[in-house]
Amino acid sequence: MKKGSVGNVETKTYALPNELVLKSGKTLKEVNIAYETYGKLNKDKNNAILVFHALSGNAHAAGIHKTDGKLGWWDALIGPLKCIDTNKYFVICSNVLGGCNGTTGPSSINPDTNKPYGIDFPVITISDMVTLQKNLIDHLGIKKLFSIIGGSMGGMQALEWCATYPEVINSAVIIATTSSSSPQQIAFNEIGRRAIMSDPKWDGGKYYYKNQPSEGLALARMIGHVTYLSKDSMHEKFGRCLQDKNEYGFNFETDFQVESYLKYQGDSFTKRFDANSYLYLTKALDYFDLTKNGSLSDAFEKLSAKIMIVSINSDWLYTPEEAKEIVSAMSTSGINVKYHEIKSIYGHDAFLIENGQMSYIISEFLSEKIVENIMTKNFSTIYENETIKKAASLMVSKNITHIPVVSNENKLLGIITAWDVSKSIAEENSIENIKISQMMTKNVITAFIDDKIEKIAIKMQEYNISCLPVVDQNGLVIGMISAENITNTITI
């Protein structure tokens, strides 16, 4: 079948019913969040994927926007039969807090003054962005996200979700990012901010009814854009080629193609982005640090989701070494984490360019479901000195066919099934007097939380079993997985 587009889309807006309390302690009134959705939320509301955009992105991640006809910034990856398959998943992307594409930010109207906030807008953090996103997810009635996916600043948002709302996510793909902004990254952001604030048209951030500080914003974008490229990609794209001339001009006009390219990037950016938003979002990047309250592994101590960390070998803004630090911290916390390094000459921007590699990584990761994702955690157990009658009563009241037999420490000793109960009755024994220990199966086939679903399905078929206890490394029962669980998962 041919991969397709989600078609024409429009941006929706959700207005928070209450004030938003920020990390700084300040509050925002009348907060709006702009978002788009693709695909359908299923009946159980367990097929939602939340996608996060990078610094200059917006909620329009896929499809063709009804207002301007523009294609979504990740349209190559989101859509029917694409790696983020909208035939299977309900995909959500929102504009971040502090942005300038529909979500409340410095260009929004301050309800207290009826004028744009400007720099009266409170300084925000990545954590504040995530808090607003959680409000949106709650509004949509989603209790648990199938996955979260983001690159660069979007990767920071994904990490913040892992640390703040670990119980809400099943998995995460975290791309080309860091767990804390480095001095070098902060330095580039500060240079960009100074370029904007040094532009006379910035006027203390009060330029909304005049002209935007376009020269300062363009310069900030030029500086930032260099960090998204690599030495090799710039050499391949531009070399030392001149722009529309054969000889040097011997003046301070544009000579080289790379100069013309950066000027174009800067000028075009001013037509779609707000200068004050650039100040606020880069400041949020600077403040991002998951290690500030202790070790990085401590930030993930409650995380049980499976994780994919992706880096780019030529990325010098958020290096592979920084990605590996995240992998190490998660591994220390016992998290099921995988790592993939994209091979590309395109630097930081490769996650938006290398569509083939990104599609493979994401599709393989999303389709690789493990026991932990679907097992039943609310299950019944029984002791070996209890009776078959007790087991029969449990099976009827709970509508189950398999009950793990455990010790006082919850260690697996055996399993009792509906077949065992039926056998006792058929043999005309008094089930009131028969102990579980007399009828239970002691050699139990089990599953572990990180087993692949495909492996468990094969095991069930091989042994003609419809339900398995899930145990940890100490043999303690932590869940149950049934053929029905697996069937329901395959249909997502």
UniProtKB/Swiss-Prot annotation:
InterPro entries: AB_hydrolase_1, AB_hydrolase_fold, CBS_dom, CBS_dom_sf, HAT_MetX-like. Pathway: Amino-acid biosynthesis; L-methionine biosynthesis via de novo pathway; O-acetyl-L-homoserine from L-homoserine: step 1/1. Residues 47-352 form the AB hydrolase-1 domain. Its EC number is 2.3.1.31. Residues 375-431, 440-492 form the CBS domain. Keywords: Acyltransferase, Amino-acid biosynthesis, CBS domain, Cytoplasm, Methionine biosynthesis, Repeat, Transferase. The active site is at 152 (nucleophile), 315, 348. GO terms for biological process: homoserine metabolic process; methionine biosynthetic process. Its main location: cytoplasm. GO terms for molecular function: homoserine O-acetyltransferase activity. Substrate binds at residues 221, 349. It holds the Pfam family CBS. It is an enzyme of class 2 (transferase). PROSITE patterns: CBS (PS51371). One of its GO terms (cellular component) is cytoplasm. The keyword Nuclease does not apply. It is found in: Cytoplasm. It catalyses: L-homoserine + acetyl-CoA = O-acetyl-L-homoserine + CoA. Transfers an acetyl group from acetyl-CoA to L-homoserine, forming acetyl-L-homoserine. Homodimer. Belongs to the AB hydrolase superfamily. MetX family. This is Homoserine O-acetyltransferase. It comes from Methanococcus vannielii (strain ATCC 35089 / DSM 1224 / JCM 13029 / OCM 148 / SB). The gene is metXA.
